[in-house]
Amino acid sequence: MSIVTKSIVNADAEARYLSPGELDRIKSFAASGERRLRIAQILTDNRERIVREAGQQLFQKRPDIVSPGGNAYGEEMTATCLRDLDYYLRLVTYGVVAGDATPIEEIGLVGVKEMYNSLGTPVAAVAEGVRSAKSVATGLLSGDDAAEAGSYFDYVIAALQ
């Protein structure tokens, strides 16, 4: 839940106006909006590169998944793996824009481990792929921007472990 929504819900539950502290937090959140949008734009503009390079890193670290019998063996299954990495990158951009992990959780992580397990997909490899995407993506950002985006990648990785 975003800082704005959380503040409003809390104030309303107590039938009161927003406190000066809540208003200051909302002001800070609003002031960081341009930065969060810039980060999301960089990730969006570089999504093909991020996914491609993350896939290359994953397949180097885990050659078993692209070998015969592996979950990403063959052109179609490799494309499916890369599609999933793209999906998680997209979720990260949602979190960055929202300034909160709620959209990541609500849109894309509920039941994901169970789904991968039921399909026989090695969840550890998916987490490793997201780690690789984080490495590539944060390499395109500097300092605080990399830390901001990195925290949402970490959220996805933790959900997969």
Swiss-Prot record:
Coiled coil: none
Protein name: Allophycocyanin alpha chain
CDD domains per UniProt: APC_alpha
Gene symbol of the encoding locus: apcA
Lineage per the UniProt record: Eukaryota, Glaucocystophyceae, Cyanophoraceae, Cyanophora
GO biological process, alphabetically ordered: photosynthesis
Gene3D superfamilies the record matches: Phycocyanins (1.10.490.20)
Entry PTM: Contains one covalently linked phycocyanobilin chromophore.
Membrane topology classification: Peripheral membrane protein
Protein species of origin: Cyanophora paradoxa
InterPro entries attached to this UniProt entry: Globin-like_sf (IPR009050), Phycobilisome_asu/bsu (IPR012128), Phycobilisome_asu/bsu_sf (IPR038719)
SUPFAM superfamilies reported for this sequence: Globin-like
Keyword terms of this UniProt record: Antenna complex, Bile pigment, Chromophore, Cyanelle, Electron transport, Membrane, Methylation, Photosynthesis, Phycobilisome, Plastid, Thylakoid, Transport
Assembly information from the UniProt record: Heterodimer of an alpha and a beta chain.
Residue positions where N4-methylasparagine is found in the record: N71
Its biological purpose: Light-harvesting photosynthetic bile pigment-protein from the phycobiliprotein complex. Allophycocyanin has a maximum absorption at approximately 650 nanometers.
Chief site of localization: plastid
Pfam family, one: Phycobilisome
